[in-house]
Amino acid sequence: DREAILTQARAVLGDEVDTLDSADALQHTRAVQLCLLIAGVAWARELQRQGVDPQMVSGLSIGAFPAAVIAGALDFASALRLVALRADLMEQAYPEGYGLTAIMGLTRPWVEALMQGHEVYLANLNAETQFVIAGRDEAMAEVAQLALRAGASKAQRLAVSVPSHCALLDKPAAELAKAFAGASLRRPRCAYLSGSTARVLWDPQRIADDLATTLLLATDKPV
């Protein structure tokens, strides 16, 4: 139940758990990512309590971690530690001046053409004319203005404090991969579907690799 989840989280994170959902805390990606992990596991366990047992799990980006927990591939305590590290590595690499911007109403070739010469990356391919770019604030603002002039219906800076799903996170992803060496992953009880490759993974090492690269790979019409 809810209290059992929070008790398990406090055993790893201490009193931080009680302030994660505050407005101040949610300005930082650590709180956002931990909240998404805890909420994802809590809701899935509630469904299990009601008799809903999954045959397959999947998650987009940070959602892959609660998916792995529910599949039995990764224990909740390890997931908490790894997600906290994931967030810290991202924020330490880019403490300010970087993030994400959504662009709607233009096709992919058009968006990619506007990105040329700017320090930005295509991070999310959500639909045929809906994309998210990652990079420096100034560079994203320039591309956003170009997009609006080119006929985009919307170009909006997202409330995200770090860049995601792009090559800017090569080093944090490598550090996170090293941390997985100390985590014990198991063969999942049900199918684990990679949100990045749309392939079912059963091998614990392949699942670990998939989780480690969730912050790095662009998401293309996420499954």
Residue positions per predicted region:
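Helix-rich "cap/lid" substructures immediately adjacent to catalytic or cofactor-binding pockets
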Residues: 1-58, 133
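A short, mixed-charge helix-start or loop-turn motif at secondary-structure junctions
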Residues: 25-29, 68, 210
